[in-house]
Amino acid sequence: MPVLSLAQMLEAGVHFGHQARRWNPKMSPYIFTERNGVHIIDLVQTAQLMDEAYEYVRSASEEGKRFLFIGTKRQAAGLVAHEAQRCGSYFINQRWLGGMLTNWTTIKTRVERLKELERRQETGALDLLPKQEASMLRREMEKLQKYLGGIKQMRKLPDVVLIVDVRREYNAVQECHKLGIPIVSLLDTNCDPDEVDIPIPANDDAIRSIKLIVGKLADGIYEGRHGQLDTEEDYEDYEGAEADYDEEIDFEPEEEETEE
């Protein structure tokens, strides 16, 4: 039985690609037709490739491999955080900071700084400081939580990266290539399939499409780790996709040269 039925994908709008004039010719094998100037994705191929992707992440999870979900676009941010946490994985859903993987040593120092500030907050140590200093440290902690909270427990580089939009996450894709980290990703009709290892042709803009695909990948990871899936009733639908997204960026990690 396929992981996704054609009915499920049609209902979620997985088949809707971009306007034909915005396509990437390399996606031609995955396009069924053009309708009213919009490319329609071949859902038969999507179903087959989704089965392969599901088995890939399930098997990798069963082997103990760790996953990083990346989705920083507004309609993906909340879903990415929710599904990654549900299957015990890491996530980045606000902004990709340059060198997050290739310069992991520097990023890790910021993660440790976050943990330190959280410990001081929990023990009440911040309350003993002058009001202005405590306020400054709390603001620093909140910024670190926003941009690095999803990788707070990540002790080493991930084994597999799952991406919602490879065009938007171009820098993350390049870092994965440099480090040899395999990429599983949705591929809309304007994407380059050569950039990923495990492609899933699908609408990467519609919330319902993203939720369906990312949710099933999370199911595969969960199944590999725990042996079976819990029932759907054990998880509430996540409706805060856009509420958890903040476009304001004013945190940058310390500058450091990336090792070649």
Swiss-Prot record:
Record key words, sorted: Ribonucleoprotein, Ribosomal protein
Organism encoding this protein: Cyanothece sp. (strain PCC 7425 / ATCC 29141)
PROSITE patterns linked: RIBOSOMAL_S2_1, RIBOSOMAL_S2_2
Lineage of the species this protein comes from: Bacteria, Bacillati, Cyanobacteriota, Cyanophyceae, Gomontiellales
Family: Belongs to the universal ribosomal protein uS2 family.
Span list, region Disordered: 225-260
UniProt keyword annotation of Cell inner membrane present: no
Signal peptide positions (record): none
Origin superkingdom: Bacteria
Protein name listed in UniProt: Small ribosomal subunit protein uS2
GO cellular component: cytosolic small ribosomal subunit
GO BP field: translation
InterPro entries for this protein: Ribosomal_uS2 (IPR001865), Ribosomal_uS2_bac/mit/plastid (IPR005706), Ribosomal_uS2_CS (IPR018130), Ribosomal_uS2_flav_dom_sf (IPR023591)
A GO MF term: structural constituent of ribosome
